[in-house]
């Protein structure tokens, strides 16, 4: 596996550096985080560069650049302080519809290319069905040639502003043998109520509770095949976990570099604190974790490009990077001292964001269970 970037990949990374240096994006991110607002202007700037088309096949007007390129771009964005967690639907969201959607659904989603606007997200989690997805209660029932959706979802990302969501529901006519199907739902339909929730971190991407009261759909609104809901979302989970891990690494690298610069400039007891051995020890441990994360992520990206990545790989990346990155940011915050916890330094935002990532997108505990099963399966 050769992880040296080719000329095209270097061009993408250079473009990211140029964009991030073009203005004071950090002030914009801090404002969006404070007000819990999606940074649309920034995402539009990325879309103008073609970042939202990185994984779209060439026959559909995309770049088909692959996951190694995506990883390089994601890492550099994060290293320079960008909230890449708001971008999760950009690289893969279009392809999901190209694989599973009807032509009408595809046309609606592909119209968002180049806009920077939020377009769709999945609605799976419920008050009584978090990690235990099989316990979901939202139902779809057929009456008089129509489909009616009833139930509630919670902690649904991006749902305050997305015009469409894909809802996982069970067939109300089959209570003894659950059939899980997804439905493409226009959020402007009658019977939908959205309640925005406050959260510790990841504040630039909304998190909502959604209730459905006899929301009327048509058969053409089915997303994918009936009864295939679980199989479809398993693939989405793996993709999301890899992206979360990339975000974790980039954020941790940014915090590490901020702390390193500070340690070389901050003078106490007559010399830079970076000369103190206890501070050097922190940076040694941070560097080990960052290097391990980077190698793990590039290996996973290479596997994804070669069709050999597994759910175990995605779980390993998600678990290790979520925890290692949080530890790096926590250590970097310790180095910064009062500047990191009492001022307006971005590291406090990073700390909040990374703590959330140990729960969202699949909890630490579920990643360990998934990985443990995957490891033992290799030796059967």
Swiss-Prot record:
Catalyzes the reduction of crotonobetainyl-CoA to gamma-butyrobetainyl-CoA. PANTHER family: ACYL-COA DEHYDROGENASE, ISOVALERYL-COA DEHYDROGENASE, MITOCHONDRIAL-RELATED. Its cofactor is FAD. Keywords: Cytoplasm, FAD, Flavoprotein, Oxidoreductase. It catalyses: 4-(trimethylamino)butanoyl-CoA + oxidized [electron-transfer flavoprotein] + H(+) = crotonobetainyl-CoA + reduced [electron-transfer flavoprotein]. One of its GO terms (biological process) is carnitine metabolic process. The lineage of its organism: Bacteria, Pseudomonadati, Pseudomonadota, Gammaproteobacteria, Enterobacterales. It comes from Escherichia coli O6:K15:H31 (strain 536 / UPEC). GO terms for cellular component: cytoplasm. This is Crotonobetainyl-CoA reductase. Pathway: Amine and polyamine metabolism; carnitine metabolism. Homotetramer. It is found in: Cytoplasm. One of its GO terms (molecular function) is acyl-CoA dehydrogenase activity. Belongs to the acyl-CoA dehydrogenase family. The gene is caiA.
């Amino acid at each position: 596996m050769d992880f040296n970037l080719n000329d095209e990949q270097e061009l993408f990374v250079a473009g990211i550096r140029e964009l991030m240096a073009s203005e004071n994006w950090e002030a914009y991110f801090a404002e969006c985080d404070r007000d819990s607002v999606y940074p649309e202007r920034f995402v539009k700037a990325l879309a103008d560069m073609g970042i939202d088309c990185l994984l779209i096949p060439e026959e559909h007007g995309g770049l088909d650049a692959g996951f190694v390129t995506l990883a390089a771009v994601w890492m550099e964005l994060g290293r320079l302080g960008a909230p890449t967690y708001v971008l999760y639907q950009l690289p893969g969201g279009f392809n999901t519809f190209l694989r599973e959607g009807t032509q009408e659904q595809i046309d609606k989603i592909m119209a968002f290319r180049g806009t920077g606007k939020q377009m769709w997200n999945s609605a799976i989690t419920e008050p009584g069905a978090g990690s235990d997805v099989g316990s979901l209660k939202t139902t779809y029932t057929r009456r008089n040639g129509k489909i009616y959706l009833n139930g509630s979802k919670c902690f649904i990302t991006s749902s305050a502003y997305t015009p469409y969501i894909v809802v996982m529901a069970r067939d109300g006519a089959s209570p003894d043998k659950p059939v899980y199907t997804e439905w493409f739902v226009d959020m402007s339909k009658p019977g939908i109520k959205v309640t925005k929730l406050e959260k510790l971190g990841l504040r630039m991407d909304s998190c909502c509770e959604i209730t459905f009261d006899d929301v009327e759909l048509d058969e053409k609104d089915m997303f994918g095949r009936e009864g295939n809901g679980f199989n479809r979302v398993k693939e989405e989970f793996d993709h999301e976990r890899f992206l979360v891990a990339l975000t974790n690494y980039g954020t941790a690298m940014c915090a590490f570099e901020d702390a390193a610069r500070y340690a070389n400039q901050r003078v106490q007891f007559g010399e830079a604190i970076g000369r103190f051995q206890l501070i050097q020890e922190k940076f040694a441990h941070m560097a080990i974790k960052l290097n391990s994360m980077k190698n793990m992520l590039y290996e996973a990206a290479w596997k994804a490009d070669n069709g050999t990545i597994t759910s175990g790989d995605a779980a390993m990346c998600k678990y290790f990077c979520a925890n290692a990155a949080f530890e790096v940011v926590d250590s970097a915050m310790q180095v910064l001292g009062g500047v990191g916890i009492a001022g307006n330094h971005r590291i406090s935002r990073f700390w909040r964001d990374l703590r959330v990532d140990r729960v969202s997108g699949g909890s630490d505990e579920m990643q360990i269970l998934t990985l443990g099963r995957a490891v033992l399966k290799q030796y059967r």
